[in-house]
UniProtKB/Swiss-Prot annotation:
It comes from Acidithiobacillus ferrooxidans (Thiobacillus ferrooxidans). It comes from the Bacteria. The keyword Transcription regulation does not apply. Keywords: Calvin cycle, Carbon dioxide fixation. One of its GO terms (molecular function) is ribulose-bisphosphate carboxylase activity. Belongs to the RuBisCO small chain family. HAMAP family: RuBisCO_S_bact. The basic functional RuBisCO is composed of a large chain homodimer in a 'head-to-tail' conformation. In form I RuBisCO this homodimer is arranged in a barrel-like tetramer with the small subunits forming a tetrameric 'cap' on each end of the 'barrel'. The keyword rRNA processing does not apply. GO terms for biological process: reductive pentose-phosphate cycle. RuBisCO catalyzes two reactions: the carboxylation of D-ribulose 1,5-bisphosphate, the primary event in carbon dioxide fixation, as well as the oxidative fragmentation of the pentose substrate. Both reactions occur simultaneously and in competition at the same active site. Although the small subunit is not catalytic it is essential for maximal activity. This is Ribulose bisphosphate carboxylase small subunit 1. InterPro entries: RuBisCO_ssu (IPR024681), RuBisCO_ssu_dom (IPR000894), RuBisCO_ssu_sf (IPR036385).
Amino acid sequence: MADIQDYNSTPKYETFSYLPAMGPEKMRRQIAYLINQGWNPGIEHVEPERASTYYWYMWKLPMFGEQSVDTVIMELEACHRAHPGHHVRLVGYDNYSQSQGSAFVVFRGR
């Protein structure tokens, strides 16, 4: 329980922000879960000072039908390399409900 962060200490952008940082293996499992749900991965990024707004920039189009965790990770890293100072998040778009099934910040900007 000591690993849970105080909600006032850092900005929060989604549910996982209240937990300790995810390691690479936990990140892979979250991406695999998103794909296994049939959701389409999409990548978004934004400057840290604008992170609390509703509108983040989309990195390319959502990866419709993508089944490879490694491909999603490669795109996340490419977005982070192209925008190193930005927050980068992964969104799982649910075709059936026409909504976001999941969204979490993968890389935090400075």
